[in-house]
Amino acid sequence: MLVRENALRHALVRLGGTKLVFSNAPRHYVEQVLGAMGIRRHFDAVYSIESTRYRPKPSSAGFHVLMRAHKLDPHRCVFVDDMLENLHAAKRLGLATVWVAGGVAKPRYVDLRVASVTELPRHLFRHAFRATGRPATRGPF
């Protein structure tokens, strides 16, 4: 059962920047899930298995489709996922990585582990402040 979650919508708003959905599921399913959760409008684009010509994560080909389409520098992107093999692929391409998982030790290729996506704004802004010495208003690690 899917539910609308105010904390998730609030976190997506606070993150700012360009947000993309990259899913191995079919487009119609992804759109239905995002709609049911009330969060579709917070994403700039949705990339489904069809969008990547059936090259699912963790294939680098799918990541390249997104990065080319949006002219993204991988070193200025954060990839959030719950699957370690997808995070490992993203890290090899130069993206910062966030693993959504319970209390498990994180591998070296994971930059940040959170229990919930709703924690992202707090962690990303804190990390950016430590890295630059000044408050961050948006952007990846």
For each predicted feature, which ranges?
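Asp-based, Mg2+/Mn2+-dependent phosphohydrolase catalytic module
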Residues: V13, P26-R27, Q32-F141
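Short, acidic loop-to-helix structural element flanking the phosphoryl-transfer center
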Residues: M1-V21, R27, E31, S60
